[in-house]
């Protein structure tokens, strides 16, 4: 069996990591050992923040819905309660879109919720 030197493989692996670390500051983009750590940490942050993004957007939608609902003299929790009682199955993302871009439709939804609460 012939001997296999690892030069080509190692260079390819190093190049892959250094390409992933492009744009990083200082040694993090130039030195393999440091770049590898930076890339691993970046991956951990990316994985975590894909989960956090969902929470962040949900809270943003709730803030927007609450602000729009209060303009119609109803709180967010009352609005959601009214929509549940009226069997309106609009999710928070859709409600927030209506609240921002289609105020007339949102007003109609609010009236439906108020009617269910009365």
From Swiss-Prot:
A Pfam family: Ribosomal_L20
Keywords: Ribonucleoprotein, Ribosomal protein, RNA-binding, rRNA-binding
Matching CDD domains: Ribosomal_L20
PANTHER family assigned: 39S RIBOSOMAL PROTEIN L20
Protein name as it appears in the record: Large ribosomal subunit protein bL20
Disulfide bonds: none
A cellular-component GO term for this protein: ribonucleoprotein complex
Flavoprotein in keyword set: no
Protein's organism: Francisella tularensis subsp. holarctica (strain LVS)
Family the UniProt entry places it in: Belongs to the bacterial ribosomal protein bL20 family.
GO terms for MF: rRNA binding; structural constituent of ribosome
GO BP terms, alphabetized: ribosomal large subunit assembly; translation
Function according to Swiss-Prot or TrEMBL: Binds directly to 23S ribosomal RNA and is necessary for the in vitro assembly process of the 50S ribosomal subunit. It is not involved in the protein synthesizing functions of that subunit.
């Amino acid at each position: 069996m012939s001997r296999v030197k690892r030069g080509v493989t190692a260079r390819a692996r190093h190049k892959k990591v250094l390409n992933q670390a492009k744009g990083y500051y200082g040694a993090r983009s130039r030195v393999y050992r440091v770049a590898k750590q930076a890339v691993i940490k970046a991956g951990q942050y990316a994985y975590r923040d894909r989960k956090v993004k969902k929470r962040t957007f949900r809270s943003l939608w709730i803030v927007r819905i609450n602000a729009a609902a209060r303009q119609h003299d109803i709180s967010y929790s009352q609005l959601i309660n009214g929509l549940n009682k009226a069997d309106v199955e609009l999710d928070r993302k859709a409600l927030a879109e209506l609240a921002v871009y289609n105020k007339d439709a949102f007003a109609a939804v609010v009236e439906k919720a108020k009617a269910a609460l009365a």
